[in-house]
Amino acid sequence: KLWYNINIMKNFKTFLSEAEGKGLTMFDVDETMFITKAKVKVVKDGKVIKKLDNQEFNTYKKKAGEEYDFGEFKNAEVFNRTSTPIARMINKVKAILKNAVRAGSKVIIVTARPNFDNKKLFLDTFRNQGIDIDKIYVERAGNLGGGPAADNKKVIFRKYLDQKIYKRIRLFDDARSNLKAFLSLQKDYPGVSFEAFLAKPNGSVSRVR
């Protein structure tokens, strides 16, 4: 009888977790998990006319004849050496990852950067903070072209939503433009719960609706 009751309880718990569905949590990197130093150069007619930090790059719209130079943005050595971890957010990532993996949910990173020139060194920056980066896939929105970061990230958000396996999806990002792009997808996926969190420099967050 006891064995039967335990089995019923187990089945009920399984049912509850399936009813809630799987969750997807997405983290930005620059100014969300780490304070970073790399800049994107804006080049016109072979000359560097501007240098954009991460936050400026998020909202910059290229003008005619301008190209981006991602040299610093791709440099894993610069990222590894100069990035300062934001402790509260790093702890949040670790806690969410631990719970997510246990519950069958997923955690990914969505960065505005393209591929790094040294993948191992880039990933070691996370390992050095105790983050099990091998359980987190890193989506590099910078590979999708020279458009605004929010547009590129939106393509990635949609890719995961189109898998139709997530009932809850949340984003931690320091750029309102990225959070706005994320929330704009709600109308296309009415069966999914969206949560957007604005990351502050001290690692605290506030919900954006």
Task: Give the role of each language-model region.
Residues 10-20:
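Proteolytic processing junctions in secreted/extracellular precursors
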Residues 119-123, 154, 179:
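Short, surface-exposed alpha-helical segments at coil->helix boundaries
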Residues 123-132, 158-164, 183-192:
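Short, surface-exposed basic-aromatic patches at helix termini and helix-loop junctions that form
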Residues 92-96, 156, 181-185:
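A short acidic, amphipathic alpha-helical/loop segment
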Residues 20-147:
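Alpha-helical substrate-recognition element adjacent to the catalytic core
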Residues 1-5, 18:
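Short, positively charged and aromatic/hydrophobic N-terminal segments
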Residues 23, 153-176, 182:
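Conserved Lys-Pro-Asp/Glu-containing loop-to-beta segment of HAD-superfamily phosphomonoesterases
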Residues 168-170, 176-209:
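Asp-based, Mg2+/Mn2+-dependent phosphohydrolase catalytic module
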